[in-house]
């Protein structure tokens, strides 16, 4: 697992095992906030060990940017912490998270110690503010990757933990393309120093404009291509011919997963465009 100090008392963690998924920690003198948990227990436990033994504070809050397994299944490794999330996150963990975990535990012994912990504090509109030491964390909706997405701004440092609303390759299979485009545009206007993506590396201030433009161009490109394909009888075959490079992205993103995710985006978007409203 990679670890980096982003600013004073703000830390970033990236999985070496699963899809470069990330998590964060903001620490104060008395307690810390964890922003997302990683996909596998060992890595999440390493984050807890770092907080308890290097920072010497307990974890009081865990913020889930959305309900997906690689961001929320590690809540159970922070006993006593209050979990904060979008109201829809709680519903989705009940509807999808619990059955998905039960199925995964049959296949992967490492997950047998995992238990879904539902959010204790939820919201669906506006903002929630947490004071951690000298820093304000502003939590607000960031939809599009999923219907329960939120982002966390470290106000004083202008660092945004964007969750999966911002990734090297936008992923909309469980989301909405128009909502994620809106979220990305809003992120681009925030005057940020850093974007901590839900997967991949930290985006620095001088890289933000280009990253925003690249993601919006990608989404516009697939929207145009899928709309054209949807008018043809062999739509699926046409989608299979659309390479990720044609959209301005690289297949090496996310440890080589990008091409697979791109194809899933195309098929999901076709389904969304053609299903009855």
Please give the residue ranges for each predicted region:
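Divalent-metal (often Zn2+) His-rich catalytic cores of metallo-beta-lactamase-fold enzymes
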Residues: 85, 181-238
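Active-site environment of divalent metal-dependent phosphoester hydrolases
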Residues: 20, 40-42, 67-73, 90-93, ...
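Conserved beta-strand hairpin/beta-sheet module of binuclear metal-dependent hydrolase folds
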Residues: 2-49, 151-164
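C-terminal regulatory/interaction regions
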Residues: 228-277
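Core dinuclear metal-dependent hydrolase active-site scaffold
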Residues: 122-154
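Divalent metal-coordination and catalytic microenvironments
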Residues: 9, 26, 36, 51, ...
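Active-site HxH/HxHxD metal-binding segment of metal-dependent hydrolases
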Residues: 44-45, 49-129
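Active-site neighborhood of phospho(di)ester-bond hydrolases with catalytic His/Asp-centered motifs
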Residues: 35-37, 60-68, 84-87, 141-143, ...
């Amino acid at each position: 697992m990679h670890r980096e100090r982003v600013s004073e008392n703000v830390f970033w963690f990236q999985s070496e095992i699963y899809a470069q998924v990330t998590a964060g920690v903001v620490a104060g003198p008395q307690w810390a906030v964890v922003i997302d948990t990683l996909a596998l227990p060992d890595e999440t436990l390493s984050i807890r060990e770092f907080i308890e033994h290097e920072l010497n504070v307990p974890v009081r809050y865990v913020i889930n940017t959305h309900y997906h397994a690689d961001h929320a299944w590690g809540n159970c490794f922070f006993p006593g912490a209050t979990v904060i999330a979008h109201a829809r996150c709680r519903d989705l963990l009940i509807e999808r998270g619990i059955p998905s975990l039960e199925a995964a535990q049959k296949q992967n012994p490492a997950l047998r110690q995992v238990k879904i912990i539902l959010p204790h504090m939820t919201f669906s509109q506006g903002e929630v503010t947490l004071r951690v030491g000298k820093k304000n964390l502003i939590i607000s909706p960031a939809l599009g990757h999923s219907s329960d997405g939120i982002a966390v701004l470290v106000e004083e440092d202008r660092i945004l933990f964007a969750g999966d609303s911002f990734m090297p390759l936008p992923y909309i299979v469980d989301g909405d393309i128009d909502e994620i485009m809106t979220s990305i545009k809003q992120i681009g206007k925030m005057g940020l120093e850093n974007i901590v993506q839900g997967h991949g590396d930290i985006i620095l201030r001088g890289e933000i404009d280009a990253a925003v433009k690249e993601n919006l161009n990608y989404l516009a490109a697939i929207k145009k291509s899928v709309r054209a394909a949807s008018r043809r009888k062999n739509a699926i075959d046409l989608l299979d011919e659309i390479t990720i490079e044609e959209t301005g992205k690289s297949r090496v993103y996310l440890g080589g997963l990008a091409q697979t995710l791109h194809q899933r985006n195309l098929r999901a978007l076709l389904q969304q465009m053609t299903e009855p409203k």
